[in-house]
Amino acid sequence: MSFFFVDLRPMNRSATHIVTEFILLGFPGCWKIQIFLFSLFLVIYVLTLLGNGAIIYAVRCNPLLHTPMYFLLGNFAFLEIWYVSSTIPNMLVNILSKTKAISFSGCFLQFYFFFSLGTTECLFLAVMAYDRYLAICHPLQYPAIMTVRFCGKLVSFCWLIGFLGYPIPIFYISQLPFCGPNIIDHFLCDMDPLMALSCAPAPITECIFYTQSSLVLFFTSMYILRSYILLLTAVFQVPSAAGRRKAFSTCGSHLVVVSLFYGTVMVMYVSPTYGIPTLLQKILTLVYSVTTPLFNPLIYTLRNKDMKLALRNVLFGMRIRQNS
């Protein structure tokens, strides 16, 4: 990833004007609206950090949560912190800025991290679906299959594939000539706005990028769907109502996160976006990049007794230390 920190301006110097920065319009409005948005996103960011940080701390400190399911959940919370950090801090700076400018290299760095972390999230959701499938459909074999070592390999696989998939296509996109307007009507550097500003068409690069993104979305979503079909079939065969409720409580929260994330991502990157208003595109991007990390702690702890107890112990322990 180190080559992303060098000058990423296009190699084609024949153009009369080379873009050295982009203007992110974000959410335009009067000063009062900007202050409201700044306060709103700052609160969302702090709550996201606190909520997901609490999950990480609870999983790390509570021996009862040292299981594959909570190990994956802790890593997922860590991922959510990085994912939301790829967008909101720059949004906050952009809201207060008069120029709304982001450097050329900074724009493509954000582009890289945003898509790499998004891909990692897709893979994590698939791995978590696999974990729930094994736990409910094959409970006897689960401890032998989902060992700590195997779980660590799955987590490493998600991070490696997520971050090794986009350096080359994004590097080639950064080498396209950007010699005209530099205004991006978005709050982040995304594929469609950047390609619209390029002075030369790049159908092959664009095709490779979208094919790669679509394949990740398709295969992970199909795997999750298959896992839940098998899982729900097994749940409905459980004779006791209490057993069915327990099974639903362990997988229901994951299903909510999957639906929220994939539903908005597919509207943005699988269906054509040229007919979608710009404001709606921004809102959809906010849902899967900001709202999902915010509600992740609430969704995963709402019906999970072990996690609620662990978080309660964390808060209780903090109060004791403050009073002592």
Curated annotation (Swiss-Prot):
Stretches assigned to the Extracellular side = 1-35, 86-109, 171-207, 269-281
What is the name listed in the Swiss-Prot or TrEMBL entry for this protein?
Olfactory receptor 11H4
Keyword Membrane annotated:
yes
Give ranges for the Cytoplasmic compartment: 57-64, 131-149, 228-247, 303-324
Where would you find this protein in the cell? Cell membrane
Keyword Mitochondrion attached: no
Organism expressing this protein natively? Homo sapiens (Human)
The entry's family comment says: Belongs to the G-protein coupled receptor 1 family.
